[in-house]
Amino acid sequence: MLDPKFLRNELAVTAERLATRGFILDVAHLTQLEEKRKSLQVATEELQAARNAISKSIGQAKARGEDVDAIMAQVGDLGSQLDAKKLELAAVLEEVNAIAMSMPNLPDESAPIGADETQNVEVRRWGTPRSFDFPIKDHIDLGEGLNGLDFKSAVKITGSRFIVMKGQIARLNRALGQFMLDLHTTEHGYTEAYVPLLVNEASLLGTGQLPKFGEDLFHTKPATEEGQGLSLIPTAEVPLTNLVRDSIVDEDELPIKLTAHTACFRSEAGSYGKDTRGLIRQHQFDKVELVQLVKPEDSMAALETLTNHAETVLQRLGLPYRTVVLCTGDMGFGSSKTYDIEVWLPGQNTYREISSCSNMKDFQARRMQARYRVKADNKPALLHTLNGSGLAVGRTLVAILENYQNADGSVTIPEALRSYMGGLTQIG
């Protein structure tokens, strides 16, 4: 959520910056609402003051033995007018809040301006795609050939965009998650968390999935015994970031760095026909998430660090990748700046996203009222929040199967994972 004061005082600037994201802000309507809000605020305060003044005169009139019926009627009339104005004001504030909640974050000045993914800017590459001297297979053919990926059973059990993994490929998938967690907790300073896979509406509002992206989520029915509907998490960013919702942490506790390995669930609304085969776009997938909560002045440097943490996973696994900075028109709703890390997939002969690392600045913190106490003046200030995949486990599995495949259909285990695989060097 954007800063309401900045929005009021810099409406034209806000509209101009949001336009680079493809979001058209109705400046005239917001200006009209703001004028109405001010007018109603003044009217409410004047009616309140008038009612208070007349109410005081009732006691004085009674002391003089005067009839107070007329004054009482006047107080009642002012009270009715006041209640009506308060309702009008509340309606205006509710509309302004609804508009504010629908606005994406302002892009950072360092984010390249562009309309869509074709205008993202590559910032670096690591590794060289392998040259094969045999006809390569994609991860689907490899996984099915090794009896490790069972798409047919998943369709029978649930439906499309799900997977059943078996044997050593299931073990490899588990090993990847453990390897990522160990790397981030032992070398990168993150604290591991086990979090709920179901979250409430307030949590989704806090991180920005609601109210705009409810169709992308899976929602539970019936409600819990508390009468509350819940939703499956689309990413562990939601529960991890909401750990500081409605709280004030000490400045000395910062930065807070959290990680979790969870299943994630997405309806993939609007993705009909995209990546219908394989593991690239599933309704249920595993991901190791990285979240940082930092002071505002540290957040841009933290974005670089967090992105490097995600890249380190690919480097340790020997997987070629490139990192791109997203243009304004391709960034996620709550992001002010985002790096996408794209891994090389020989089966598709292209780079595909495997991690998205974003600085949300105070956009989520304002929604969540997540603050820290500044030592200099002992006053609370909004945190900056960052998140990124470190990494998407299923897509990393895809990359290993395709990049480490052999001519006979077997797959070599990357050295970094062999201790997690009981010393196994090859599948198949």
UniProtKB/Swiss-Prot annotation:
Enzyme class: ligase
Residue sites binding L-serine per the record: 235-237, 289, 389
Catalyzed chemical reaction(s): tRNA(Ser) + L-serine + ATP = L-seryl-tRNA(Ser) + AMP + diphosphate + H(+); tRNA(Sec) + L-serine + ATP = L-seryl-tRNA(Sec) + AMP + diphosphate + H(+)
EC number of the protein: 6.1.1.11
GO terms (BP aspect): selenocysteine biosynthetic process; seryl-tRNA aminoacylation
Location(s) in or outside the cell: Cytoplasm
Matching SUPFAM superfamilies: Class II aaRS and biotin synthetases (SSF55681), tRNA-binding arm (SSF46589)
A single GO cellular-component term on record: cytoplasm
Pathway the protein contributes to: Aminoacyl-tRNA biosynthesis; selenocysteinyl-tRNA(Sec) biosynthesis; L-seryl-tRNA(Sec) from L-serine and tRNA(Sec): step 1/1
CDD domains associated with the record: SerRS_core
Residues the record lists as binding ATP: 266-268, 353-356
Pfam families reported in the protein's UniProt record: Seryl_tRNA_N, tRNA-synt_2b
GO molecular function: ATP binding; serine-tRNA ligase activity
Keywords from the UniProt entry: Aminoacyl-tRNA synthetase, ATP-binding, Cytoplasm, Ligase, Nucleotide-binding, Protein biosynthesis
Assembly and interaction partners: Homodimer. The tRNA molecule binds across the dimer.
UniProt remark on domains: Consists of two distinct domains, a catalytic core and a N-terminal extension that is involved in tRNA binding.
Function per UniProt: Catalyzes the attachment of serine to tRNA(Ser). Is also able to aminoacylate tRNA(Sec) with serine, to form the misacylated tRNA L-seryl-tRNA(Sec), which will be further converted into selenocysteinyl-tRNA(Sec).
Protein name in UniProt: Serine--tRNA ligase
Record lineage: Bacteria, Pseudomonadati, Pseudomonadota, Gammaproteobacteria, Alteromonadales
Gene responsible for this protein: serS
